[in-house]
Each structure stands twice: as structure tokens, then as C-alpha cells.
Amino acid sequence: MMLIEKFPRNVRLTIGPYEQCPCGSKKSFKFCCKPKSTEHKHNWKEYRKHPDKRKKYEYVKNWNDTAFEICLAFDHEECRGNIKNAHSIQKKRILNRISRDGHLYQFIPDHVGDIVLAKFDRVSINKASTFQGFCDFHDNKLFLPIEASDYCNEARQNFLFSFRPLALECHNKIRDLTFRMNIFSERPDLTINEAMVYDYRTAQLNEREFKKEYEVFKKDYSEKNFNNIRTFYLKLDFEVNFATSGAFSVEFDMNGQQINENQMLSEIQEIKLIYLTIYPLENSTNIILSYHLRNDKSYNRLFEQLENASQTQILKYLNKIVINGTENIYFSQNFIENLKEAEKDSLLISFQASLKPLLAKKLYEENNDYRFDLFTT
């Protein structure tokens, strides 16, 4: 549940009587969960007695229940083979490089009492960064220019490095909305809980906006127009100990000036996305940051700043937006295990703050955020 100081005035915090019921029944709320919302009161005292292990199990089960298969490639008539657990970060050349004994570290939810925090968890490279978003044929063919060839800052490569995290996030946003609808289905009383309805509205907005961006990419692909992607590329002369691929909105530029509002203030709000991929190579690291030119008004200034900044300034900025922007990040075991406890705690709490605006504000005011360096060698 998102923690905010005050709910925005332009977000509906109630479900309208003739609005489609958020439980997913496709009936009007008035004739579905509205009568049940007062009949089925949840016993929070009993819930709080549940052990954390049970809460974690229920959370993971509810999320796993939202899994679905789809091929997000643009030419569906060419689909062949089963939908597979496609890697959004390449396994052979990237994940293998930072793994030890075939494992990495990732962020996962950690249930402590009534609070959901975060912790590090070891994950197999066979499962890391995977999602059921492409058929076997398209997973191999579509991304061949970035899978089989070295990166050379070519237009088609930049398009694909942007599309891959977009596809992952489209899939995740659909699942997140389904996750919240399933909660309402199980717990009709929560349909009149303002915080839960706000999270539901946010999930609706995210699904709509990511699907809209997907359609923009689909149009460009069908027209073979790969030049609508602006890319900033930086090659480091050392290997980082993590890999990430994300699609997200950036709130502030390098000077701290606001670009976007990342908290939903209105249901007609637009989400302006950037695409970030960072991965190590032999004695080097590729950093690829892109946006679609339809969002040039939002990101032109930021990219001009990046193009004129020193490497130190760029890495300091990326150190923040990587953790703020995406959960799709995987660390080498050596990196996590060699962090000082204060650095490890800061990394975890900074990731948690990306999901909780009140916590982010508190850490910023205390100058206690981002006390780690992702780009240390």
C-alpha cells in the first residue's frame, strides 16, 4: 500500500456505483461488490496475529496467481513455439558474467509485522529477469541485433534496448492491476478503503500509459522507423558488479529540477518513460539511456546535461535513478557480501523509499539516502 501525506484532489478515492467493479467481474460496482463491502468486514486483529511467514506466503501466492502468457512481439502472425520465460537481461553474456555458482542477488519483499520491507535474496540466473512475454521464435529473432552482435550505438539496437524493458514493464503493470483486482475479489470490504482504491487507480494509470507507449513502439516498428529513439551512451573502462534493464519515469534532472511528477496526482496524468540498460563486459561497462522523441519536451534538458557532464557527475546521478526506477536489477554475490552493513542498509532502505514517498522524503531530509556506490570496482 502506498504511503502518502494527502490524497490528491483529482484522484477518485471511491468506486462509482455504475463503474465496472474492481474485482474483475465486469459487473457494475453497485450490483457486485458494493453490497458486500459492508457485509464482509475483515478482522485485522486476527490478521496481525498471522506469522510473517504466512503473510509472505500469501503475498507470493497472490502474485504468482497473476502469471499469464503472451507474446509481445509486434508481428503475431510469425509467432512459433511456446511462450517462454524470456530473459529481459541476457543470460549468456551478461548474467553469467556477474554470477557465482550460477546465482545472483535480487531485491524481494520482506514481511515484518504489518510492514512490507525489502531484503536481498539469492536467485538462479535461469530465473533472474525472466517473464512470460515472448514466444520462442520472437525471443530469439527479434532481439538478435543486440544478442548476437556487440553494441555499436546503432538505431535498431537502441530501439530494441528500449523495447525490451518496456515489454517487461507492460507485462508487470498488467499483472499488478490483476493483483489488486484479485485482492478486491477476495476482500470486498477493501473496495471502500481509500488507500486501496488509490493504489488501484495508480495501477489503472500505469497499465494504460505503458500500453500507450507500447503502441507507439509498435507503430515505429511496423514502419521500420528506429530513429525516434534518442540515446545517451557511455562506456566505462571498468566492469560494474550489477546488471539492470528498466523502463520508468525520472522525476528530477541532474540539477534537481523537477521533470515529472512520479506520484499520481490525476487520473489523466501522462507517464513519460526513459529506458536504461547497464551491463558489464570484459574490462568495460555499457550504459545505454534512451527516450522516445515524443517525450522530448520532458527529457531534452536532462540529456543535454548528461552530454556535458563529467563521468563522475553522471555516475552519481545514475546511482540514484537506478534504485529509484526499477526492480529489475541483479547484483553479483561478491558485491553484496562485501558491502559494509551501513551501505547494505542504505541500499535496501533507498530501494524501499522508491515505493514509499513519505520514507523517501524522510531519508532526504536526514541526508541518509543513497549512501552506497553501485559503480565501485
Predicted regions mapped to residue ranges:
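Cysteine-centered loop/knuckle micro-motif
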Residues: 30-34
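Charge-dense, low-complexity intrinsically disordered regions
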Residues: 45-48, 207-377
